[in-house]
Amino acid sequence: MKKVCMILTDGFEEIEAVGTYAILRRGGLSVDIYSLLDQDATGRFGLTCTKLNPFSQLNAADYAALVIPGGPEYKTLEASPAVQALIKTFIEAGKVVAAICAGPTLLGHAGYLKGKNYTCFTSMNEDFGGIYHDDYAVTDGNIVTGKSAAATIDFAFAVLEAVAGQETADKTKKEIYYK
């Protein structure tokens, strides 16, 4: 079974994290959630996730993909040298890096969106050197980006397809009566 890791910190966007987790699990992927703070993480609307894995124990070699949900505290992730190093490790290994809403700004500021097709929360779009698309989800090579909380399901299916293939994504869509 392919494995995905997700990073949370306080202020994460609940629907982006939990919705993506649920779709990936329905698609047969193993998903481990890590707390940047090595403790419980509370989302922007008060949902607290417990029993999270400590970020300090995350080993990139164990995973096929990295998922970065958005939320108002995305800058905490961006300011972490350890998170930046993890993203670089995944990118350089050609593994899937997926970020939604505010999450893609971490990739953009680090230069990973240069020459790439991408999306992100509209008001957070800067000149990242790539081609911005006003779509719910955009995949370009090993980078998957999502626009906003409303785009969570489309984003999650794009991640599932990038990791497990189109057949698995289509089967999972059918199982939940997704368009």
Predicted feature locations:
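Short, glycine-/small-residue-rich phosphate/pyrophosphate-handling segment
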Residues: 100-136
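Cytochrome P450 catalytic-domain "roof"
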Residues: 139
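Extended, subdomain-level signal for the structured scaffold at the beginning of enzyme domains
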Residues: 1-93, 106-109, 131-134, 143-179
